[in-house]
Design a protein with these regions (language model features):
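Bacterial N-terminal signal peptides that target proteins for export
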Residues: 1-8
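Compact beta-sheet-dominated domain cores in extracellular/mature segments
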Residues: 4, 22-135
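C-terminal segment of classical bacterial N-terminal signal peptides
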Residues: 14-22
Length: 135
């Protein structure tokens, strides 16, 4: 019976590892969304977005004030690794106008949407916001 319990736990861990990828303490994970494929998310599985306005501005922060209330920035807590296992792309940080450091992915600041819950992607291609898809 104990061996069966251990096997069940190992299988559950393997399934979880195949659907999310992150280094311990990493600010983001990768998870599989039925509609959008592999997307970046917070460790609580809240989808991450970039804003086309900032992409066109060469990565400069444009989402401040009421924009940042609706689209909360993903702030860096400590060092952010440039690479994360299982995620093709480069991470970094950018200094926001308020002086705080925000996480970037491939040079673009990344945000959550305040009105989404875990595993929801409600605002892809809405007003220039796009979920961050990864390989």
């Amino acid at each position: 019976m104990r061996i069966l319990s251990i096997l069940a736990l190992a299988l559950a861990a393997l399934i979880l590892a195949s659907t999310t990828t992150a280094a311990a303490g990493a600010p983001v994970i990768k998870y599989r969304d039925d509609q959008f494929g592999s997307v970046l998310a917070t460790p609580k599985k809240q989808a991450l977005y970039y804003w086309r306005v900032e992409k066109r501005a060469g990565g400069k922060i444009r989402c401040t004030g009421s924009c940042a209330k609706a689209w909360p920035p993903l702030y860096a807590k400590g060092a952010v690794p440039r690479k994360m296992r299982g995620i093709a792309g480069t991470f970094g940080t950018i200094r926001r106008p308020d002086g705080r450091r925000q996480v970037t992915f491939n040079g673009l600041a990344i945000y959550t949407y305040a009105h989404e819950g875990p595993t929801q992607v409600l605002c892809n291609n809405v007003n220039g916001w796009f979920v961050v898809r990864v390989r």
